[in-house]
């Protein structure tokens, strides 16, 4: 079973993604901010992370940089409520960029592609 970590400061987004992905057979761990994600990373050992860009404290971009220091090949999907960052995601060393909640089918398809399940 593939393991996914959802990192988002919005509780409703975390639980929506968790419910949808667990229905598809994924094991899901939640983190409400970047520091919590870093703390859980070595214990949960996710196969993929979805990471919100704008969060209080350590934002998604800083969290991504910290993760990449040790996890260069871990697929990471950057998420934002706005499409304004789409052109920047490759410079951050992320694997994909999605607008949050725009299309859960797109989220699930992107996850499957990055995990080699399609």
Model-predicted segments: where are they?
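Acidic catalytic/metal-coordinating carboxylates
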Residues: 32-36, 59-62
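Alpha4 helix (beta4-alpha4-beta5 surface) of REC/receiver domains from two-component response regulators
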Residues: 62, 83-100, 105-109
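Charged docking surfaces used in two-component/phosphorelay signaling
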Residues: 15-23
């Amino acid at each position: 079973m593939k393991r996914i970590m959802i990192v988002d400061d919005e509780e409703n987004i975390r639980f929506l993604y968790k419910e949808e992905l667990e229905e598809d057979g994924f094991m899901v761990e939640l983190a409400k901010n970047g520091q919590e994600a870093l703390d859980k990373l070595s214990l949960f050992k996710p196969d993929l992370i979805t990471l919100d860009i704008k969060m209080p404290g350590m934002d998604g971009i800083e969290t991504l940089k910290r993760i990449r220091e040790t996890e260069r090949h871990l697929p990471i999907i950057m998420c934002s409520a706005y499409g304004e960052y789409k052109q920047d995601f490759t410079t951050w060393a992320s694997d994909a960029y999605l607008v949050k909640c725009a299309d859960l089918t797109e989220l699930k398809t992107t996850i499957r592609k990055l995990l080699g399940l399609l």
